[in-house]
Amino acid sequence: AKMSLSSYILILTLVLFSQGILLSASKSIRNLEDDMVFNTFRLGKAFQKEDTAEKSVVAPSLEQYKNDENS
C-alpha cells in the first residue's frame, strides 16, 4: 500500500510540475508572439513609408505612360 501511495504522489508531483512548465512556457511564448507582432507592425510601418516614397517616384512616370497611350 505504501508503494502505490508514493508512486501516486510522484505522479501527482510530475503532473503539477509539468503543468507549471507548460504554464511558464506558454507565458514566454505569448511574450515572444507579442514581440513578433510588435516587430512585424514596426516593419510594416517602415515598408509603408518606403512604399509611399517609391510611389511618388513611380506614379509620375506611370501617368506619363498612360497619357502617351491615349494620344
From Swiss-Prot:
Where would you say this protein principally sits, based on its record?
A: secreted
Residues in the signal sequence: 1-20
| Domain of life the protein comes from | Eukaryota
Name its species.
Answer: Carlito syrichta (Philippine tarsier)
Molecular function terms, GO-annotated: melanin-concentrating hormone activity; type 1 melanin-concentrating hormone receptor binding
One GO cellular component term noted in the UniProt record for this chain? synapse
Gene that this sequence comes from: PMCH
What is stated as this protein's family in its record? Belongs to the melanin-concentrating hormone family.
**Protein name per its UniProtKB record:** Pro-MCH
Record keywords, A-Z: Secreted, Signal
Q: Where in the cell is it found?
A: Secreted
Kindly list the biological process annotations in GO that this record carries: chemical synaptic transmission
Classification via PANTHER family:
MELANIN-CONCENTRATING HORMONE, PRO-MCH
Keyword Metal-binding assigned:
no
